[in-house]
Amino acid sequence: KSPKSWGLNTIANSPDKDIFMRRKTPYVERFEIKGPALSGKAAWWPFRDPFDPAFRKNVADNLKSRSGMTDDPWCIGFFVDNEIHWGDKFDLARFTIMSPASLAGKIRFKGELEKKYGGISGLNGAWGTKFADWDAFLQNREVPKGADKKDLEDFTSLMAEEYFKVIREEFDKFAPNKLYLGCRFAGSNENVVRIGAKYCDAVSYNRYADNLKKLKLPAGIDKPVMIGEWHFGALDRGPFHPSLIKRENQADRADSYYEYAKSALENPNVVGIHWHQFSDQAATGRFDGENFQVGLTDVCDTPYAETIAKIREIGRDLYRIRQAAPLP
């Protein structure tokens, strides 16, 4: 009952199923794709190879296993994956080169290069390499210093395109009435955002910042934006870590909540912001030691009155602020 009385209108990512299946509040859900992954740097989750048949099957299986949600009018839609490391406009190709020869994506990369260069001598001339044959290209796991930037950029774009396209196609088959809410960018590049916007119903970001005044989609892209995570924390009460965005005390934290939410309402593309998280984390830490003071309630389920007051205040001001926002 508390969230509704505070003015909150959805249950955010990764909720307790026993709560959202009471069907009293609209909710979203998330799943992560499993399967063969690219080598190279990863964030929370590695980048799964969208050219491997297991990728498509895993997306389909995840959606089919959620048939109670895909048919539920209270379910808004699904995020897929979380905080993938996209890197720059060349990195997915670099990660592919660093991967084993058996990776489906690497075999596809070889095929694209064969179409462009024909024999291996053409690639060697362009990249400054000395591969004996195309199998040697597959076996190699070091990114050549002279690798053609256009080739890397083109394949990175192709892999991103395949990633979003396959997910979109499986949504259309198994969850046609639900929104594909994107992958919760926590770092990306403009090209990937452009590609994702073609297939996602909303572009999602985990955006830890003072506000959203600097959040802009690439030029020419007009798409709804969802904020999957944001928060502020302070050390005057609660656990012993002030969170990713520190504030001096609970009053300062509450004011920051209002200002962030206000900046979202002033951005005509932003359609929702999901606070991370409902309760403080345990003082002893979660699996990775994280013990942030980020809750709307403490670990004993006592609300932080200062923040709750500001949540209610922005709820009262919501339509006035939104109606004054510029058109996209």
PLM regions: where:
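Conserved, mostly hydrophobic/aromatic
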Residues: 3, 11, 78, 119, ...
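Substrate-binding cleft of secreted/luminal carbohydrate-active enzymes
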Residues: 12, 73-77, 81-83, 230, ...
